[in-house]
Each structure stands twice: as C-alpha cells, then as structure tokens.
Amino acid sequence: MIKLTVDDKEIEVEEGCTVLQACEMAGVEIPRFCYHDRLSIAGNCRMCLVEVKPGPPKPQASCALPATNGQIISTNSKMVHDARKGVMEFLLINHPLDCPICDQGGECDLQDQAMSFGSDKTRFLENKRAVEEKSMGPLIKTNMTRCIHCTRCVRFSTEVAGVNDLGALGRGESMEITTYLEKSIDSELSACVIDLCPVGALTSKPYAFNARPWELSHTETVDVMDAIGSNIRVDTKGNQVLRVLPRLNEDINEEWISDKTRYAIDGLKNQRLDKPYVRNENGSLEEADWDTAFNKIKDNIDKIKPNEIACLLGDLVDVEAAYAAKVLFQKLNVDNIDCRIDGAEIGEHGRVGYIFNSQINGIDEADALLIFGSNPRLEAPVLNARIRKRYLQGNFPISLIGENNNLTYPVNYLGSKSIDIEKLRDKKNIVYKTLMDAERPMIIVGMGALTDDSSQALLYELRELAEVFGVIKKDWNGFNVLHTSAGRTGALDVGCLPSKKGLSAKQIFSESVNSSLSFIWLIGVDNKEVLNLKKPFVVYQGHHGDVGAHVADVILPGAAYTEKNCTYVNTEGRPQFLKPVSYTHLTLPTIA
C-alpha cells in the first residue's frame, strides 16, 4: 500500500493507482474529459491538472501520473485553479458555443466544467475553426466542430468494440476525428461512443431535437433484445419512449449496451395490437370486444381433446406469463407445451444444463475459451466485448467451432461442422493442449449447436470433453450455454416443457401440417414456421401484428416489455425485475 496526502487528508491506496484515482478515493472529484475508467490513458485534455510535491514546479496531469509514497497533492490551490481556467480557455477557443441547439445541452461535461472553471469573458477575437461533418452511419449524428479531441471514441472503437474504424488525422488545430473512408462504424456497439463523448460532437440521430434532458422521465429497467439482460434506463416524454441509455452493472453489461438494445424502441409505436380481433366467416380479421374473443376461444377449446391442444411460448415471454400459461394448460390436461420454438434440445437434464454457469463476470477469471456453435458478436455483443477485454489482458487462448464470422479477437479455428468436435480429442492439436493446461477453462455453447439435428449427441460429447479438460470442478463450472432470447431461461425454469408423451415445438410445427392438432395458443411466437399452421384454430397473444398475428383466428393484445411489471431470467440464471416506463399520459392497449 502507498501512503499519500490529498488536500491535507492522508490516505492509503494500492500500488499502480494513478493520482486521479487516489484523489477520487479521498472523496475529491477531479474534472476530466479524456480519462475514462474503462479506456486506456491518453492524457491529452489536461483538465485533470493537480499540484504535486515533491515534483516539478508546475501542475501535473493526474490521470497519467502514478501515485507514489509520500506525495502531497493539492487539488484546490491557486496554481491548479489558474491552470484549469487556462486549459478551459484553450478548449473553448474553437468550440462553437452553440449550446441552445446542441442535443448534449443540459448533460454536457464541457458545459458543466466551463461553468465551474471557465471565464465569463473571452480574449479570442480571431475566426474559429470549422470542420466538415463526417458520415458515421444512420445512428450517429456528427458535429465535429464541437470536438475537443479527447479521443474517447477512438479508444473505445479500438479497445472495446475491437474495430479500427475511427482514428485521428492531422495535428494541432488541423487534427480531426474521422472514419478514414467516410463509412459507417462496423460495430454492434457503435452508439456507445455517443455516451462517451463529453461534448456534443457525437449525438444520436434518431433522438435529434426531440427533447431536453430535464423534460424526460427516467425508468430503470432491463433489456430484452438478447439473453444477457443488460441494465438500461428508458427515457420518456409524454406518451413516447425517446431513448434508451445504459446503466452500470459490473456483473452483466458493465456500462455498454448494443445498438439493437438502444434503437429497437422505434418498434414500440409501430404495428401495435391495441384491440382483440376475431376472424370472421369470410376469413378476415375484425375488431371484437374481450367477451366475444374469449367466447370464441371457449367454443373451440370445449370440443377438442387435450391431446389435440398445444401451447407455444415465444422468445420475449416473461416468467409470470410463462408460469400462468403452464398452470392454465396443466388444468386443461394438455401435455403439448414448449418454449423452445427454435427446436433447441435443452432443459431436460437440470438447470446447470441450460444456463451460463460461470456467470458473465466469470469470463474475467477464465484462462482458456472454446466457443461452440455461437457467434457472440451478433448474439450477445456486450458479452463479446467482455471476451475481448479478457483477451487483451493476455494468456487467454480462444478456439472456435462454428461459423467464423469476424469476431473481434483472434481464434484457433477448428471448422464449422459438428464432426470437427473430434479434433478436440487429438492430443497433438494446440487446442487440446491449451484446454488441458488451463486452470479455469471455459466452454460457451450456442444455439447453433443446440438446434442442430445431432444436438443431443453433440451436447453429450461436449459434456464428456468438459470432464476431460477440467471445465467442471468443485470450485469452477465453465460449461456455459449462451441463449439468444430473453425469455427462454425463465420459461425453462418454470417448466414450460412437454411431458414425456407431449410434443416438442419442432414436432408441433410438423404435426400441425399433418392435421393432428386442432388448437394452438401462441404467446409471442412469430417465427416463420407458424405459417405452416393451416388447419388448427390459432390464438395469438402478443403486442405486435407480426407473423403469428397473421395466421391467428383470435388475437389478444398484450403489453410490451416497457409497459409492465414482470421478471426475466438472463442466460446466467439471474432473475431481474422490469418496471413499466413513466408515461405521463398514455392509454396502453387493453392488456391480455
């Protein structure tokens, strides 16, 4: 431990800390623009200057200065105040000062720090620099004249996202942040640069000019666009969801979210189901009241045997809805209920067989990884960023069996066919050696493997290999299943599976073509296989007029994930509670 003094307060910090981190531990807030906890140190904004003794007779950049024993640090002296005022003056020399029309206004670091450390007068009378706008795709709006060259966006895209699409060209006043070839940022996490930008140089295009921060209501909830369960904040104004921002959760998403999580909200106001519908004698859907819809369902279900009835649960079904469906169909003596609409062969051998056992933060402790039948970059971008972070720390060989789809880290590629699993038994193979030598090896099994025709045999062989490589030990279980849907783990937990004599989802879709089923209840099921449901009477319960609604005989509208209190269980088996967003005036669709 290192002892040092911050503003006359003696503290102890661990070796390797910077002066800025030491000041924060002492409860002193240091202004900064370029420094970020999760990015490398750049030290180029100079806003974090402090006075350090013993040392040079000038202020030092605290973000890049290592803390050493016996340092006396002053953060509030006249020297520090003058230095910060001077730095702020330089930063504002070329800034357009267009706060009234800037989307960052009201939550801008430059605004806040200019008020705290800047001057109310200017000495700069020359023309300001103007920079041509850059094209960064449909999500990121640029106004590079506002840029202060903190390079947070460049470091994020290179270090966290793993794409080298952003960089700085030129020096001094001529320096510009650019995508080099005027192209979109090729990353599933690209819009995180909006959150990182301390000024209004990078803002959200879909959110542009919609609202000011103080006009918004905030609701802390959880994302359902993948199975990770990223923690998010949903901002609303009136009856509209305007934006989604990440919330800090070190165990799950740290402080990143995917672009899909951030921008899928535009679907909340399009193609919504707002009333019950019943198909008439002419084959057309017409509006109905709830009594008519339920009577239509009752009339059909009363004259059908239980073995001719089935219920399928979609990818976005919450735990409460899944449990209610299970109880309802159990009372009807129905055996044909399934939540595995993609045909995955999981859930029949205990909970450890279908969750991410090591937990997401367990990636930080692993020392070797085998990815089997999964593409984390597309299926779980936040988890993929965590794998990349662990790779950058070193001593973390990664192997892949499956489609080699340009992951953001190098892999030992073994092939894309299920038969390639046999290569793991070859003692001369480098992958065999790395997994055998690892103390905490990890296997991530994706839905690509579990929906394969030979998935049961593959799963058995993978578990056998996991024993050989020591993936499962007394104090470590690195055998992980990566789901792609938010509702799957919770539905499996409450037992939404067919009985021994029941039909699975894969069988239901094929059997319905053969007319063995007469009644199917779909809860949020919208995959293309439902188009095969020609003969059965179909009830669709959901919130959007998607594929399932098109084949339905009765439609019951429901609430989307932002509109109800409910529970989701993420891929690691962690239950998380969702809250309805803070609409100030909105009549929701009559909720099924």
Residue spans for each PLM region:
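Eukaryote-biased recognition of intrinsically disordered, low-complexity regulatory segments
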Residues: 1-7
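Serine/threonine-rich, repeat-prone extracellular segments and beta-strand-based repeat modules
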Residues: 33-42
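Fe-S ferredoxin-like electron-transfer domains
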Residues: 46-223, 228-232, 238-240
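Short, contiguous acidic and Ser/Thr-rich linear segments
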Residues: 11-16
